[in-house]
């Protein structure tokens, strides 16, 4: 759990996660700094590009962020971003980091961002919209046989399998799919978002069906 101390509603927000850049704009927040990603749909990239760029999620510009005079920075709980917390603290800039391991975590994050930015109503409406969409899809396919899925997650240095203990894996599980990578999950798997990913190698693939 994190405790973020804000003197009031965060009105000058910097996002160092492209997903959060999109979220802020969707909630009606006008961020004073964002990062973009070519992995996002073109229309989303175009919206994000209208706001001041803070370089990239992997290498956010400390100088640009400080110069934007934010009263909140939102990022992801990965070392390349949480390492910036010390610099933010030294400049009296509150920062909040998240990493979601399932669908409910994402919905909670949307509500938290809404609260911190004074957009509670918009956040609640967005969560309801996503819940309605998911429910409709589940109902539409409830009588179909459950498919067996293998979800491959790629990074610049490796490939991993996303189990049902990840956000995308949780979505497939809610839709009724069987994740074949779950055979590699330990009995006492933690709620850490990264523990749901399994290294992909030839040995792993050999026993999966």
PLM regions: where:
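Alpha-helical, coiled-coil/dimerization segments enriched in small aliphatic residues
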Residues: 39-40, 160-196
């Amino acid at each position: 759990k994190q405790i973020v101390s804000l003197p009031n509603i965060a009105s000058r927000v910097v996002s160092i996660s492209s997903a959060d850049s999109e979220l802020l704009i969707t909630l009606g927040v006008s961020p004073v700094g964002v990062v973009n990603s070519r992995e996002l749909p073109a229309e989303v990239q175009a919206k994000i590009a209208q706001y001041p760029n803070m370089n990239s999620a992997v290498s956010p510009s400390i100088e640009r962020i400080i110069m934007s005079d934010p009263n909140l920075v939102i990022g992801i709980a990965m070392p390349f971003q949480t390492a910036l917390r010390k610099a933010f603290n030294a400049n009296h800039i509150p920062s909040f980091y998240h990493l979601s391991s399932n669908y409910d975590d994402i919905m909670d994050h949307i509500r938290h961002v809404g609260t911190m930015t004074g957009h509670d109503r918009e956040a609640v409406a967005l969560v309801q919209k996503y819940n309605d969409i998911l429910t409709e899809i589940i109902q539409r396919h409830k009588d179909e046989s459950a498919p067996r899925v293998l979800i491959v997650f790629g990074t610049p240095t490796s490939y991993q399998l996303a189990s049902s203990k990840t956000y995308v894996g949780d979505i497939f599980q809610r839709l009724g799919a069987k994740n074949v990578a779950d055979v590699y999950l330990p009995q006492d798997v933690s709620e850490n978002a990264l523990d749901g990913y399994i290294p992909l190698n030839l040995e792993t693939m050999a026993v999966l069906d």
